[in-house]
Amino acid sequence: LEMASLGSKVLQIRAVEFAQKYEVPLRVLSSFEEGEGTLITTEYGADKTMEQALISGIAFNRDEAQLTINGVSDTPGVAYRILGPISDANIEVDMIIQNIAPDGKTTDFTFTVNRNDYQRGMEILQQTADKMGASEVSGDARIVKISLVGVGMRSHAGIASSMFETLANEGINIQMISTSEIKISVVIDEKYLE
């Protein structure tokens, strides 16, 4: 499910959701070569336990854009006041980062949206910034999200560390990080994708 939702384009996400919900095994086959492909089931082995972290795939999504609003007063409800108008415009938000400034009075808020919604999102965010007295609005439509997908990703610190080390060794700066039990995602400059 994570691979499909992250843009791997191997399976249609609704097919994966139904297979997961009703425990229907899925077999993924290559259209380029013969073979048995990959069988996706709910069983994890004879005892159905997951002892080790296992990377099952790497996915990327280049259809993302990043929006940032800086210098917003850090008060309860700030996330709603920023994302409410974005949601009202039917723009889906993916990754979110909120940083409190050292003065403890203001916050910076960054989030990602689909690249097709970038211009509209920037316009809405600028209107929101004007109402909230924010110091700056910025954006970047040249980003890509890279995700490692597998079992036990968050509970095995070595996986994230290895990913970050690999990117650092290649001189690639990480702009955003998101983790869950089954994925680690980073946002980087699009020029590093290939």
Q: Can you name each region flagged by the protein language model?
A:
Residues L1-T179, K183-E194:
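C-terminal catalytic "cap/lid" subdomain
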